[in-house]
Amino acid sequence: MYEIKQPFHSGYLQVSEIHQIYWEESGNPDGVPVIFLHGGPGAGASPECRGFFNPDVFRIVIIDQRGCGRSRPYACAEDNTTWDLVADIEKVREMLGIGKWLVFGGSWGSTLSLAYAQTHPERVKGLVLRGIFLCRPSETVWLNEAGGVSRIYPEQWQKFVAPIAENRRNRLIEAYHGLLFHQDEEVCLSAAKAWADWESYLIRFEPEEVDEDAYASLAIARLENHYFVNGGWLQGDRAILNNIGKIRHIPTIIVQGRYDLCTPMQSAWALSKAFPEAELRVVQAGHRAFDPPLVDALVQAVEDILPHLL
């Protein structure tokens, strides 16, 4: 990764009556614009996210999406949909006076990157996508319902289902929704920790015991659940795949961990079949972007796409 430099410009943008989103710029003010779209939904961005981009070459824009990270109010699901986030990205672009930019997103960030590019293809110079997630029911069931990745880590799955009454475990995402939006804050926080611990375990190539902070877990747990319950506000399983025609001309590199248990290879494969113009690069790695094999592959992908952006 590149040196993590401090932002030269940052602030908050009022994007609705309720929400203010945090934004920042780092790197070269006159460089090639790139926006980093974090995962989750609800994960927020960290300073380390700047490290995928050469700060001498890129004007690096990072935002925390509605309800998470440094954005306000925290863990708020009201007025918080995929299309709200797409509109927010455009508002940030317009505020910063950027004509076109490279869009970089992983996991949920790949969903949002594709949704944004298909809505505003004229504003996208290129796409670098990692850990493809298309927000299809089959993907959310794999993650958070019995019979998917639960078969690989049954001992951790037992902890994930523990907050849910046995007679409600046939629809876990729905059952968790009731807990994560419960009026009792302690109920919300306990459920959020169980949800986030499960996901944190899955994203590591070499799993280790995790113990996430309950309050810090609330945004990712509540917002992921909110989006999953609502199908990401996408029209059907193939909503993104059926609109690839809008972005075929955009240079695109897909980086996918072969052993990714959070966003399995199947979705990257489906995207590459629908979008053969994109280059699919499979790495011997899991899901977490900061694991060394994925870091190297992502830095290389950004370097390789750069000539197409100039």
From Swiss-Prot:
Its main location: cytoplasm. Keywords: Aminopeptidase, Cytoplasm, Hydrolase, Protease. It is an enzyme of class 3 (hydrolase). Coiled coil: none annotated. It holds the Pfam family Abhydrolase_1. GO terms for cellular component: cytoplasm. GO terms for molecular function: aminopeptidase activity. Its EC number is 3.4.11.5. It is found in: Cytoplasm. InterPro entries: AB_hydrolase_1, AB_hydrolase_fold, Peptidase_S33, Pro_iminopeptidase. The active site is at residues 107, 260, 287. It catalyses: Release of N-terminal proline from a peptide. SUPFAM superfamilies: alpha/beta-Hydrolases. One of its GO terms (biological process) is proteolysis. Residues 33-290 form the AB hydrolase-1 domain. Specifically catalyzes the removal of N-terminal proline residues from peptides. Belongs to the peptidase S33 family. This is Proline iminopeptidase. It comes from Neisseria meningitidis serogroup B (strain ATCC BAA-335 / MC58).
